[in-house]
From Swiss-Prot:
Zinc finger (C2H2-type): 224-246, 252-274, 350-372, 378-400, 407-429, 441-463, 550-572, 578-600, 606-628, 669-691, 697-719, 792-814, 820-842, 848-870, 876-898, 904-926, 932-954, 960-982, 989-1011, 1017-1039
Gene3D superfamilies: Classic Zinc Finger
Pfam families assigned: zf-C2H2, zf-C2H2_6
Subcellular location: Nucleus
SUPFAM superfamilies xref list: beta-beta-alpha zinc fingers (SSF57667)
Cysteine-cysteine disulfides: none
Family: Belongs to the krueppel C2H2-type zinc-finger protein family.
GO cellular component: nucleus
Subcellular location, principal: nucleus
Cross-link type Glycyl lysine isopeptide (Lys-Gly) (interchain with G-Cter in SUMO2), residue numbers: K802, K1040
Name of the protein in its database record: Zinc finger protein 865
Ranges annotated as biased composition (Low complexity): 93-119, 297-316, 324-337, 463-480
One BP term from GO: regulation of transcription by RNA polymerase II
Length: 1059
């Protein structure tokens, strides 16, 4: 095949040069690209539309260019398809080339010009703005071609002037057009300085009388902005392509596997996986033979199955190595064999036999199969942590860097390693800033909102029914039994060996209790965990899940996103990439690590608006709010002085049914001030803050006033002596049946309440609606004479309390449905994970024991942190004063003492703080409503009691006086702090062993006995001694488990015991 030096395009064989129509396929021509450029001619770039008009109208554009001189014929070369580039004839040296070319040019000029004119392809028509045919690319005055030398100085000079707004200039460049003129030949050497343009033809951008350069600059700007994300583009077609991201439309579909894409380039890249594959074989490979139950030997593969290739490539087949059967007949779960590197044209695709992912190279397949085998070949040299990918190891090594730069947020103090993450984080603080509020995309079905349209589309797919369920057969074929699910052969997580020792048997029995209590539909989607192929009704096939694109190759669970599948695979591989820098504990998810940080910071940013209780997690606050949202019936609401539950007439009458649909059917709370209705008590309490200016709710018994109805409710319960006093005599329309007394709480609740509301209030009041409990709680709480103070006992677990308010608060624990019970102590839990965590408390041994005090820990990181208490090790030291700390968090807090910096500023009152936690705590003060205002100074308070205490400063009243000197104080805390000065100084008792100081001689004697090997803490039941209170508390739990019924006791056989 010969290339056309004139650049006409055709080169034979269906392939062309760069200047042709199709372009050279460089994957099929592995010759030197620079050598190819020296002997090819390129057509000048043509400008169309607005750009051509703007360039042609430049004031420095002269008339038509001069005619080029005749061109000498260059030598012809062969370009074999699969060989390196070699010239057809040897190129002479520079000394001989000039003489030979000059002597032969006169003899062959006529013939070469005629032949080249016959072989040259006619030039395409130019736009009217140019008005002349394009000139040749190179100048004939340039020297003859030099082998393998390419100079870019002329190219840089040409495009450098275009960027500066001036004309295209250079050797042989026609002014105003930007195309060089001359015969073909290489560019000048770097030592040769190309001559510049004439002074008359120079363009001055400052003398832009007609606005040509402004017009050209306008055309180069991005004038097509996106109305959703404000991103701009130069061309309208790019904007149209970008809008597919927001609309979620995927118009480009693969004809082999049916996957859709929003960009044509993504579809082109995807089609490489289906190279040389017929459409019938483009789908996922067929699942392998049926898997036997876990623990049983796998059947030997047939000859046909073993010979079938696992890839769909037309090249050398990449057959995975089948697991060889062992001596006892069981198949060894060996790793999946990796095909050898393909030589020649076999560049894939290679399919994974477990998850059906397709890869182009066998090395990529081998790297992917590490996920299934659980192998981690890359380990850290500092902490010995291992990873399955080299990129993960590089990312982890950066965490050990001492001088790692962290950029703190000026608002909340959170630090980031990347400036881009910090900018995104600060944009979240800005909210509705300069860019306006963020767009919200709500769901029309459930009302849930999302910040991105793609998330809304994925959410709507969950509402849509599966296609298989929508198109059910009408001929009764659906009732036919479904075949058991099949899975591809490969390494799976097999169960451990049968237990041999007593401890292993006990652990296996505990696991059987946990998984035996889990409902079958929960584990039906994981047939491999059940030890068999699974049932068709419970779990279905793991090979394909309706509506799920990405399926797990180990358990068959389907997911809608690839990222979710990757996070799920960590459950099988055991990878925990997120580590706490304080205690070393690891987590699979990053949000688990964020929740864990609250343990070290002890920050409780979530506060209940009604009772003021604070929590560290939003889930805890949500569960706590259910206490305030409990809907009270008419009987208890009238006793507590609360707004009664409004419902249909006769809802609390004798005709009310005991099987109501639920607590929210026809029930609502009404505001007594404005009459607005709310679904539960929590919302009406929040609404009451609008009407509150003082404390309008007073107690009839003691006259104490409250600003919240909920606080009045809890206060009135304190005045009740027994639970039966909460239930007043039944009204005329509510007579107890069977002639029982009106104070029988169980009868009143059975007939006057409906459904779950009555059951919940009955549990709160300590009674039960059934016949098994009767009035046991009432008798145990208030009835019966006892020698000590009156205590209130729980009828469910037998725990007793000194105050009735404590019993009411405790009753909420039993309102949560707990279906999983511990076989050792009988304690019940709502989830299997909570039960697994509880099982740890019954283990006799822990893996890591302290050699000094004998304390055991679950993890090595906890033991290492504990041993610092014995060695007085302080690994984190201050560089200013040299003080050591046990935690790095303590050192960061201590550094503020030396710097005095207060980097965290409140945006409301401009008050500054040294710690981010202090600023977060201060901001919550601005968020809380403060309706109580001082008339003297204008200071506001949340409660009226705080306002009255503050007004003493203006009145000069000192209500608190010291008993010793009679000095008066405004606040109680001030007088308590003052009275410490009158107390005699106590001698300091310091331990000679650990230098710990004590003020109480009793504690000091017990501490010395612990150093001497004594056990001063004795159990009152069995007399066993312990060195510390921690061991004694753990020992008492064992006695409590024995008293509750032992291992065979269930959740309903708990014996009563005082708290």
């Amino acid at each position: 095949m010969e290339a056309n030096p004139a650049g006409s395009g055709a080169g034979g064989g269906g392939s062309s040069g760069i200047g042709g129509e199709d372009g050279v396929h460089f994957q099929s021509y592995p010759f030197d690209f620079l050598e190819f450029l020296n002997h090819q001619r390129f057509e000048p770039m043509e400008l169309y539309g607005e750009h051509a008009k703007a360039v042609a109208a430049l004031p420095c554009a002269p008339g038509p260019p001069p005619q080029p001189p005749p061109q000498p014929p260059p030598p012809q070369y062969d370009y074999p398809p699969q060989s390196t580039f070699k010239p057809k004839a040897e190129v002479p040296s520079s000394s001989s080339s000039s003489s030979s070319s000059s002597s032969s040019s006169s003899s062959s000029s006529s013939s070469s010009s005629s032949s080249s004119s016959q072989a040259k392809k006619p030039d395409p028509p130019l736009p009217p703005a140019f008005g002349a045919p394009p000139p040749p690319l190179f100048d004939a005055a340039f020297p003859t071609p030099q082998w393998g030398i390419v100079d870019l100085s002329g190219h840089q000079h040409l495009f450098g002037n275009l960027k500066r707004g001036g004309p295209a200039s250079g050797p042989g460049v026609t002014p105003g057009l930007g195309a060089p003129a001359g015969a073909p030949g290489p560019l000048p050497a770097p030592s040769q300085t190309p001559p510049g343009p004439p002074a008359a033809a120079a363009c001055d951008p400052t003398k832009d009388d007609k606005g040509y350069f402004r017009r050209l600059k306008y055309l180069m700007e991005r004038r097509f902005p996106c109305g959703v994300c404000q991103k701009s583009f130069k061309q309208s077609s790019h904007l149209v392509q970008h809008m597919l991201v927001h609309s979620g439309e995927r118009p480009y579909e693969c004809g082999v596997c049916g996957r859709t894409y929003n960009h044509v380039s993504s579809l082109i890249r995807h089609r490489r996986c289906h190279k040389d594959v017929p459409p019938a074989a483009g789908g996922p490979p067929q699942p392998g033979p049926h898997l036997p139950p876990l623990g049983l030997p796998a059947p030997a593969a047939s000859a046909a199955t073993a010979a079938a290739p696992s890839t769909v490539s037309s090249g050398p087949p990449a057959t995975p190595v089948a697991p060889a059967p062992s001596a006892d007949g069981s198949a060894a779960p060996a790793g999946v064999g990796v095909p050898p590197p393909a030589t020649g044209g076999g560049d894939g695709p290679f399919a994974c036999p477990l998850c059906w992912k397709v890869f182009k190279k066998p090395s990529h397949l081998h790297q992917h199969q590490i996920i299934h085998t659980g192998e981690k070949p890359f380990s850290c040299s500092v902490c010995s942590k291992s990873f399955n990918r080299r990129e993960s190891l590089k990312r982890h090594v950066k965490t050990h860097s001492a001088d790692l730069l962290r950029l703190p947020c000026g608002i909340c103090g959170k630090a980031f390693r990347d400036a881009s993450y910090l900018l995104k984080h600060q944009a979240a603080h800005a909210g509705a800033g300069a860019g306006g509020p963020r767009p919200v995309y709500p769901c029309d079905l459930c009302g849930k909102s999302y910040s991105a349209p793609q998330s809304l589309l994925r959410h709507k797919a969950a509402h849509a029914p599966p296609a298989a369920a929508a198109e059910a057969p009408k001929d009764g074929a659906a009732s036919a039994p479904q075949p058991p699910p099949t899975f591809p052969p490969g390494p799976y997580l097999l169960p451990p060996d049968p237990p041999t020792t007593d401890s292993e048997k006990a652990a296996a029995a505990a696991a059987a209790v946990v998984y035996g209590a889990v409902p079958v539909p929960l584990l039906g989607a994981h047939p491999l965990l059940l030890g068999g192929a699974g049932t068709s009704g419970a779990g279905g096939s793991g090979a394909s899940v309706p509506g799920k694109t990405f399926c797990c190759g180990i358990c068959g669970r389907g997911f809608g996103r690839r990222e979710t599948l990757k996070r799920h695979e960590r459950i099988h591989t055991g990878e925990k990439p997120h580590q706490c820098p304080v205690c070393g504990k690891r987590f699979r998810e990053s949000f688990h690590l964020s929740k864990h940080h609250v343990v070290h910071t002890r920050e409780r940013p979530y506060k209940c608006e009604l009772c003021g209780k604070v929590f560290g997690y939003p889930q805890s606050l949500t569960r706590h709010r259910q206490v305030h949202r409990l809907q009270l019936p008419c009987a208890l609401a009238g006793a507590a002085g609360l707004p009664s539950t409004q419902g249909t007439p006769g809802a609390c009458g004798p005709g009310a049914s005991g099987t109501s649909a639920g607590p929210t059917d026809g029930l609502s709370y009404a505001c007594s001030d404005c009459g607005e209705h709310f679904p539960d008590l929590f919302h009406v309490m929040s609404h009451k803050e609008v009407h509150m200016a003082e404390k309008p709710y007073g107690c009839d018994a003691c006259g104490k006033t409250f600003g919240f109805i909920e606080n009045l409710m809890w206060h009135k319960l304190v005045h009740q002596a027994a639970p039966e006093r909460l239930l007043p005599p039944a009204p005329g329309g509510l007579q107890p049946p069977d002639g029982s007394s009106g104070t029988d709480a169980a009868s009143v609740l059975d007939n006057g309440l409906a459904g779950e509301v009555g059951a919940a209030v009955a549990a709160l009041a300590g009674v039960s609606g059934g016949e098994d409990a009767g009035g046991a709680a009432v008798a145990g709480a208030g009835g019966g004479a006892s020698s000590g103070p009156e205590r209130f006992s729980c009828a469910t677990c037998g725990q007793s309390f000194k105050h009735f308010l404590g019993l009411v608060t405790h009753k909420y624990v039993h309102l949560v449905r707990r279906t999983l019970g511990c076989g050792l102590c009988g304690q019940s839990f709502a989830g299997a994970y909570d039960l697994l965590l509880h099982r740890r408390s019954h283990r006799q041994k822990r893996g890591f024991r302290c050699p000094v005090c004998g304390k055991r820990f679950w993890e090595a990181a906890l033991l290492m942190r504990h041993q610092r208490c014995h060695t007085e090790q302080r690994p984190y030291r201050c560089g200013v004063c040299g003080r050591g700390f046990l935690r790095s968090w303590y050192l960061r807090q201590h550094r503020v003492v030396h710097t005095g910096e207060r980097a965290f500023k409140c945006g409301v009152c401009a008050k500054r703080f040294a710690q981010s936690s202090s600023l977060a705590e201060h901001r919550r003060l601005h968020a809380v409503a403060r309706p109580q205002r001082c008339s003297a100074c204008g200071k506001t308070f949340r409660y009226r009691s705080n306002l009255l205490e503050h007004q003493r400063l203006h009145l000069g009243e000192r209500a608190y006086r010291c008993e010793h000197c009679g000095k008066g104080f405004f606040y109680l805390s001030s007088v308590l702090r003052h009275q410490r000065a009158h107390e005699p100084p106590r001698p300091e008792l310091r331990c000679p062993a650990c230098l710990k100081a004590f003020k109480d001689p009793g504690y000091f004697r017990k501490h010395l006995a612990a150093h001497q090997g004594g056990r001063p803490f004795r159990c009152s039941s069995c007399g066993e001694g312990f060195a510390n209170t921690y061991g004694l508390k753990k020992h008492r739990l064992a006695h409590k488990a024995e008293n509750l019924g032992g291992p065979g006791a269930g959740a309903g056989t708990l014996a009563g015991k005082d708290a």
